[in-house]
Amino acid sequence: MEYMVDRRGIPMDVLTRMKIEERLEFLPQTGKEEACICFPYLEDGVMKNMKFRDAAKHFKMVKGAELIPWNIDAIKGKEKCYITEGEIDALSLIAAGLEEVVSVPNGAGGANLQWLDRFVESHFDDKAEIILAMDTDKRGVELRDELVRRLGVDRCKVVAWGEGCKDANEYLLKYDLPRLRQQVEQAAEIPLE
């Protein structure tokens, strides 16, 4: 957990509360067991999947498990929610006091948003405001644009990370938790065309 606290700026109490752990896991990318951060994917408090990530950014999820947004229980019945491109960005927002946050299950790699179909009615249709806190790279922008299209331009806002930051965690590391929260709360409406 040293990596998450020291190199990613996520407080240990947040990691504990969110049930983030570290353990050895076999990763096909390296062909051996690696020390991995484990992100539990829960729905109604029940484990549905687990994502494993090593320090070299190799990822693995449980084979055959359902893809669901990470931290999906946190947004049910809320007026507003935040969507990030990854769990570490979501943890950064949680550390800044923004609890109603989910991460897409598979990053921006590919525009596979099939998981969204199952959750639109139960978790997103009731939202007055959806804040999209995606990465600023090409894939992040494509993901953001597709989420806006699917969730509605009239209720989506977009976070701008500014010069030198591509995502929420980089912003946290460059500045601090209060500034991260302020930046996210200044998300801009999307102009209607």
Residue positions per predicted region:
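Acidic beta-strand-to-loop metal/phosphate-binding motif
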Residues: 83, 125-139
